Amino acid sequence: DPEQWWQATDRAMKALGDQHSLLDVKALGIAGQMHGATLLDAQQRVLRPAILWNDGRCAQECTLLEARVPQSRVITGNLMMPGFTAPKLLWVQRHEPEIFRQIDKVLLPKDYLRLRMTGAFASDMSDAAGTMWLDVAKRDWSDDMLQACHLSRDQMPALYEGSEITGALLPEVAKAWGMATVPVVAGGGDNAAGAVGVGMVDANQAMLSLGTSGVYFAVSEGFLSKPESAVHSFCHALPQRWHL
């Protein structure tokens, strides 16, 4: 339930404010788990529980999407997998059509929190690359991939580089957290943001991240892909950087 994410964020920020003054904070960035599908109607209401990255219900939809867009691996740089967002939406279209018809916006988990913080529909390149709707080389939405899921650009968030400002903290949120209406930057998917945090920002740098999933993360200055190997190819959370 995305509302529980927001309630947890609100509690955490208030608890932090009880320990330290947040008035000196100059900006906020957001990072979070990737690939999850958060579906909103035209009134910004959540339509159903989010379908998270580790939900494997949409294997058939992966096959269908690659058949509909034969160039999908070239566009996205990736082999279509059930963990990605696009096949999840095609599953909803096929199995929950009454829900699908009401979709006004599709957001990734961290970007739902951004909406609640700023009122803005926005995402960063690294997280968007994990949807399978992004042309990863061009760092832009792919109309072909969206149309294959019966979706359009209007239902997608605006795209930003990870270091760009996507909006400002809403006055009511800032007041509740004891903060100024500071800028909120795009941020990144969990692994891309973690890579920036430990200095993995230049070509040929690499790291190993172990957690709920295991990730070997290698930075490049250009788009590289080998989808037949099932190695992910995504945008990094910084401009003009990609990663495998």
Residue ranges of predicted features:
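A generic secondary-structure signal
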Residues: 12-19, 91, 95, 198
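Residue-level signal for inorganic ion chemistry
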Residues: 1, 28, 55, 92, ...
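Phosphate-binding loop and its immediate beta->loop->alpha context
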Residues: 1-20, 50, 54-78, 83
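Acidic/polar active-site rim loop that often engages polyanionic ligands
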Residues: 40-45, 66-75, 89-94, 240
